Structure formats: structure tokens, C-alpha cells
Amino acid sequence: MKRAPRIFAFLPILLFVFHLLLPPPAALSQGTDSAAVEVCVLLNDLRVQRGLSELGSDPLLEQTARAYAADLRRRGVLSHVDELDRRALQRFQARGGTTVLVGELLGSGADPAAVAAAWEASAGHREVLLNPLWTHCGVGSESAGATTVWVVLFTSHRIYPLEILRCSGGYLVRGRLASDQAEEPVLISGIDPIDPFEWDSATGAFSFFISREREGIYHRLGYRSGENTLVVTNTFFPVKVAGSDCPETEAVTSDRERECR
């Protein structure tokens, strides 16, 4: 007898919003398996049918989802908490993710269409799937005998793309604001605000410089959005998430950055 798919969902608190006076769609990435691609297409179809945007793929979300699908298969459970007591957001950030909002769908079943239909039929899962804040997703799957374990992760990239690069003397943080509500980018190093040395309000492009002395400090990146309110979109320790080194020609392109050093 054909088993109905088993499903689980988790939706975290949606946004961290701080008052400034207080301290502290893309193509699917290469290497994605065909079943995961099918799930992505099915979920995007459900969103489009309800007037929502399609989700782009996020390679880091995909890696996190695949790793957790393998973990769930090994443990023989469907749980939103891993053996280290971490939920989806913590697992994503442990792999270098910086966004502050991650949702998760879990399921098991051999037929991707049946699993997607089960998520749609469940009010809690549908709430996660149809969240209008999502911009990207990542799907992981792991075969377990006659069935398959599925993990779908969602996140909201309000700053995309975002790069955190090592430079001589510090770190270059650059990206593009994607939010229509954004008035200007904001970076807080510990409790100290850092001004952008580049900011183009027309395109949303910005750059910040973080000195080497502050590489181990907790940073909050986001944007100011009316009534002196800061919406935090990304959090990170520069020393833990920095990617490749940036060329020196890019690292010293402004007097402001030289002053930061």
C-alpha cells in the first residue's frame, strides 16, 4: 500500500527590528539533483499561482538542506532540531549563512509531487511555503529505502548579492539593497555604527570597510527604513564568514577606506 507522505514545518520569528537608539530569482545552481529541481519547480508553481514571486536558488541553502537530509536519514527521524540542538537558522549560519530569517519544510515520500501536495494541503506548511518575504530556497533529499527524506529551506535576501572579502587591514563588505523600503544601508559593529564609504541610492549598491581590529566582533547589517528604524537583515563575525581575498586595486579605492585603516 502506498504511504502518504509525512511532513513537518518550522517558521521562525520573521524579522529582527531595532530602533536606532538601541545598541545591540536566479537559476538553479549546478549540481542540484533532478528530484530536487522537480520540487523547486513544484513549489514555485504553487507560489506563482497565488501571485507570489518565484524563488531563486541559494547554493549554501542547498548544501545545508542536503546535509540535514542525510542526517535525518541516518537518525531515522523527521525533526527540526539536530543532535546539537540547532534549528534551521543555526545550521545555516554554522555553514557561513548570514541572513536572520530561515524557514524549513520536512517530508518523506518517494513521489516529489505527492510531498509537495501534502505541504500545500497543510495550513502550517502552506504558511511557510507561501511566505511573501522569501526570495530564495534550497532543497535537499536523501533516499531511505523505498522512500526519500526531503528538506526545503527558505530565506529572505534583502541584500543580494552580499560579499564579505578579506583585504589588507580588514574586510570589505559590499552588496546591493533589494528592499523598496530601504532608505540607506547600515552596519553596526558591536554597538558602533560604521558609515558606508560607497553608497549609490539609485542602484542600491554599497560598500563598507571593517578594520582588522574588529574582525571578531558581532556585526549587524541592514537598512534604515522610515521613522529612524533599523531593519537587520544579516548578522556575522567577519573572521568567520569572510570569503576570498579582494584585489588590492579594489581594497583601496577611496580616501574613506584609507581613513578606516
PLM segments and residue spans:
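Compositionally biased, intrinsically disordered low-complexity regions enriched in proline and serine
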Residues: 3, 19-20, 219, 224
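Bacterial N-terminal signal peptides that target proteins for export
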Residues: 1-11
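Functional surface patches built around histidine and acidic residues
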Residues: 25-261
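Bacterial N-terminal signal peptides
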Residues: 10-22
